Amino acid sequence: MLKEFREFAMKGNVVDLAVGVIIGAAFGAIVTSMVGDLIMPVIGAVTGGLDFSNYFTPLSKAVTANSLAEAKKQGAVLAWGSFLTITLNFLIVAGVLFGVIRAMNRLKRNDEAVAASPPKPTREQELLTEIRDILKSGIRPQV
């Protein structure tokens, strides 16, 4: 049973998946930082210094806080600013992954096209083809 598990774990697809998950987790942290530290501050500056992560709509009159963390402690809120930031994260990740997969598919198609084209016949093969064609035609060459 241990041998079977080792064979399964060492298959290319499982190892590739593990590497992809690890790289994806690291990439997610980069995208989160890019959105939170670079993109949202620029959007905030353009919109007059707004911090979208703290934007919320209280669902009860008991919520009087000015920050999202405090408002969540006081009652139910719609944290639409946080949702906007997370949605932007998702769109960036999806766009980058789409680009990577598209590039990989293009490379794969190119590799398949190169592999599918037959190799040029060697000089020996060309001579054998000529001899075959002469024999098929029934004409005897003059020697």
Curated annotation (Swiss-Prot):
InterPro entries: Mechanosensitive_channel_CS, MS_channel, MSC/AndL, MscL_channel. One of its GO terms (molecular function) is mechanosensitive monoatomic ion channel activity. It is a multi-pass membrane protein. It is found in: Cell inner membrane. Keywords: Cell inner membrane, Cell membrane, Ion channel, Ion transport, Membrane, Transmembrane, Transmembrane helix, Transport. Homopentamer. This is Large-conductance mechanosensitive channel. The gene is mscL.
